[in-house]
């Protein structure tokens, strides 16, 4: 771990940046080569800021990292923004399903500690699955349903789990969500 004194932000040695919701500060280390990769890190960390502004200080880990990964994988062109979910990531999600490694309710409802532990011990599992989930929500689910889901997440008085919240807003409920998500990556 490395600590940047002026910002009081700690980050893993290999990290290119970090965001502190408490301080509302992003730290970008400038370790990346080239403008495009540097912008990707900036988009990633800036996304954390926007998520914390919209959902508060404790958004679901998968959504926070998934949105950050989504925007990190976007490039801006003259007339459009293009997102890329890489072949490696697609293959990794397919493999997770083939090996029976995906338990969506457990993953979606997990604490940040469990999320990060799985990320560190299992070949980018958490970030890749989060990126896949957010890509599915943004690119496959009707916008109104995604908006409704975000609105439900904003209610801090709602004690229900994320999977229960999805069950409320997704047509056909959580089981249909699981089927549709898995089908998108087979």
Sequence positions of predicted segments:
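Short, small-residue-biased leader/transition segments that mark boundaries at the very start
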Residues: 2-4
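Acidic/His/Gly-enriched intrinsically disordered linker/tail segments
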Residues: 10-22, 26, 55-186
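Short pre-active-site segment immediately N-terminal to the catalytic Zn-binding motif
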Residues: 23-42, 53-59
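Solvent-exposed coil/turn segments that connect beta secondary-structure elements
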Residues: 31-33, 46, 73-74
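Active-site recognition of the HExxH zinc-binding catalytic motif
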Residues: 40-53, 65-69
């Amino acid at each position: 771990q490395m600590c940047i004194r002026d910002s009081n932000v700690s980050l893993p040695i290999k990290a290119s940046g970090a965001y502190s919701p408490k301080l509302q500060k992003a730290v970008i280390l400038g370790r990346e080569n080239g403008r495009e990769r540097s912008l990707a890190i900036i988009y990633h960390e800036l996304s954390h800021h926007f998520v914390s502004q919209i959902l508060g200080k404790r958004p679901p880990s998968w959504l926070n990292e998934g949105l950050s990964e989504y925007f990190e994988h976007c490039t801006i062109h003259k007339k459009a923004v293009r997102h890329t979910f890489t072949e490696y990531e697609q293959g990794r999600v397919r493999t997770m399903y083939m090996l029976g490694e995906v338990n969506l309710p457990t993953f979606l409802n997990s604490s940040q500690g469990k999320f990060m532990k799985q990320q560190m011990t299992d070949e980018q599992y958490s970030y890749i699955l989060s990126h896949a989930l957010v890509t599915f929500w943004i690119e496959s689910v009707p916008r109104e349903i995604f908006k409704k889901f975000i609105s439900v997440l904003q209610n801090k008085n709602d004690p229900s789990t994320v999977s229960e919240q999805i069950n409320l807003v997704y047509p056909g409920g959580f089981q249909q969500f699981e089927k549709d998500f898995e089908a998108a990556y087979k």
